[in-house]
Every structure is written in C-alpha cells, then in structure tokens.
Amino acid sequence: MPSDAGPVLTAQPGRETAQPGPKAAQRGPGAARPVRAILLPSYAWNPYQRLLAAALREQGVEAAVVSEWPERSPLMGAWQAHGKPDVVHLHWIHDFLGGSKGRPSRRNVLWFDWQLRLLKSRGARIVWTVHNLKGHEAGDDPREADAHRALIERADAIILHCHRAREALIELYRPSGAAQARMHVLAHGSYVRQYDVDADAASAREALGLSRAGTVFAFVGAIRGYKGVGELLEAFTASGDLGPDARLLICGKPLPARIGRELEEHAAADPRIVLRLERIPEEDLSRVLRAADVVVLPFRDILTSGSAILALSHGRPVVVPALGCLPETLPADAAIFYDPDDPDALAGALHRAAGADLAAMGARARAWADGLDWGPIAAETARLYRGD
C-alpha cells in the first residue's frame, strides 16, 4: 500500500487478530456500561447486519439491528427510539434519501447531512460500511453523490471490504485527507452459519424438477439490470455444447417486471433454460444453491458481492467478472474470473466452468468460507466503535 493509504485493519482468514473479551468493548477503563450501537438499515432478505450484530454482542457490544424508522427523520428518530446509543452504524443510505420515491431532492440531501451533524453534536459516533460506491440505479446523480460526500466527511470510521474499494471511493469522491485516514479494510463474513449449506444436492434438484445428470449453471437473487442476467442467457445460448444435459437455472424476482418478460421471451427458444421468476423464500435459498454445480453472477457493475460469498458458503464455485473487490477477495481456486469488457468472455467462462472439476472447486469454496468467521471482524468493528 502507498504510504498515504491511512490505517488499514484486516480481519482475513488465516491472519491472527486480537479478539477482546466480553468487557473489551466498554467505554474506557472501568466503564460502567458497554458500547451501545444500532446497525441500519436491516432488511429481512439480507442477514449481513444480523450476523455482524450477533458477533458484536459476543464482543460485549450492545448491538441492535434497525429495520424500521420514522420517515421524516430516519436517523435521529432511530437513534432516539433505541435509547440514544453511542454508535450509529450505517450501511446503505438510499432509504434515508427518499427511498423508492426516486432520486433524492436537494432538501433530502441537506436533511440527511443535518441529521449526521445533529448525531455528532449529541456525542454519537458515525460508522459507515461501504457496500456500494453509489446506488445501483443512481447513475451519476449529483445529489446522491453529495450525500455520500457528506457521509464520508462526517463519519468517524469508514469500513470497506477490500483495498480496491478504498481506492475507488477516493477516486470517485475525492475526500479530505482526514477522511481518508478514517478508512479501514475489514473482511466480509461468510453465511455458513445462517443457512443449511449442506442441504442434499440430489434432493434439491429433484425438488426443482432438474435431472441429477448434467451441469447446472445458476443465477440466484433479485434480478436487476446491473446484474446482467440477460447477457447470461445470451452467453449460455451462444455457448453451444456445455456438456450433456447442461441447464441454466435462473431464480429470483425481476425488478422491474419487464426484465422478466424479456427473459421469458429468450428462454422460450432454449429448452435448457429453467426460469423461476419469483422471490426466493429464505428457507428455500439453500435448496436452490445446492441444486447448482456453479453459480454465475454476471454483474455489469459491482463493488462487493454478498451473493458470491453466499454461493461459496454453500460450497459452490462462482463465475464472476473481474470487477470491484471480487478479484481481491474471492478465492482464485474456487472462482472463474472473466474480462467484463470482452463481449465473448462470459461465454468463454461458461466453457471453462463446464470443463473444470467443479466438485473440487466447491470443496475449496466451502473451506474458504469456513475461514471467514465473524468473530475477528466484530472485534475490529468494536475497536472502531470505541475509537481506539
């Protein structure tokens, strides 16, 4: 790393990281109470915050995940409703800028920044984990960019999941040197303990009406434009022979609905493509992933991918573009990377997967995921909460 990179804290598998005991997260020597923190927003479909909060509690932090907040004053309202905790740990901020109502207004952004100022004036520490550089559908919206710049400058600590993310954040938003010094790189934990990652693969295929023979390529998750599912169908169809009984399984809810209609039109011409265009209940997610031999995530744009870590946690190798944090953080012996700027590269990656020992890659994927324990990550996060 360059000398101006600022502090970088790592909590990576195989590296020793100090893990404080139950009282280590308390506020100073002999403190009467532990640090209290809220993590928001929390969504039912994403266990990231719940897993982190559970690990933080083991470190002595009183951590609560927040899934509801007052519309008019989300940050201040959530902080007050949870007893004015010491730390407000933000993740995605779209819902605090107007959410589904469209792009944020100047008033939304100013109010968001004012709430950050108010929280800090009341003694709260602001922590931000950067999952995306900007909203997936935000484009080059200058007002959303202003909100991110405000958060970067106000935050007491900024957590990123790879060094490339740190570099990209600096390139995009040009933060002050002081803000750069508050950026820290921590690992992204796995989902091994959250799901039935050892679900029987043969039974999973039977439940989905898939033959036990042949390679099953799968995409799993919400189907949005930036995820490139249309390009995946085109690459699969153009790839020709991917082995006897090869199938492409697409599972997830299209957003917006027109994407689903486009996929149905394409799939109608290729009987090897199986569509399940609906939201996958959490209890069925493991079955879908275990039915696959390899999970394909053809993002057009991405920083970090919980979906990739989810697949690897289920012992399934991934096919992904060499974008964002993926080349730096995913295991090279359990992932097949391709050049997103080469229009033929995805089809080539599918052929490479078809010829690979996917079972061996899957075993390596699971071993890697087993090493991504939330404990060391929570220990470092608690340290940032304390401001050590």
Where are these regions (language model features)?
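Conserved donor-binding/catalytic core segment of Leloir-type glycosyltransferases
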Residues: 211-227, 233-236, 249
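Short hydrophobic beta-strand element within catalytic cores of glycosyltransferases
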Residues: 294-297, 317-321, 327
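Donor nucleotide-sugar binding/catalytic pocket of nucleotide-sugar-dependent glycosyltransferases
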Residues: 153-196
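Nucleotide-activated donor-binding/catalytic signature segment of Leloir-type glycosyltransferases, i.e.
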Residues: 260-286
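Acidic anion/phosphate-binding donor-loop and adjacent secondary structure
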Residues: 139, 170, 187-207, 375, ...
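A charged, aromatic-enriched C-terminal amphipathic alpha-helix characteristic of glycosyltransferases
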Residues: 359-385
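Conserved acidic donor-binding segment of nucleotide-sugar-dependent glycosyltransferases
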Residues: 332-344, 350-357
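Glycosyltransferase donor-sugar binding loop
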Residues: 191, 247-261, 278
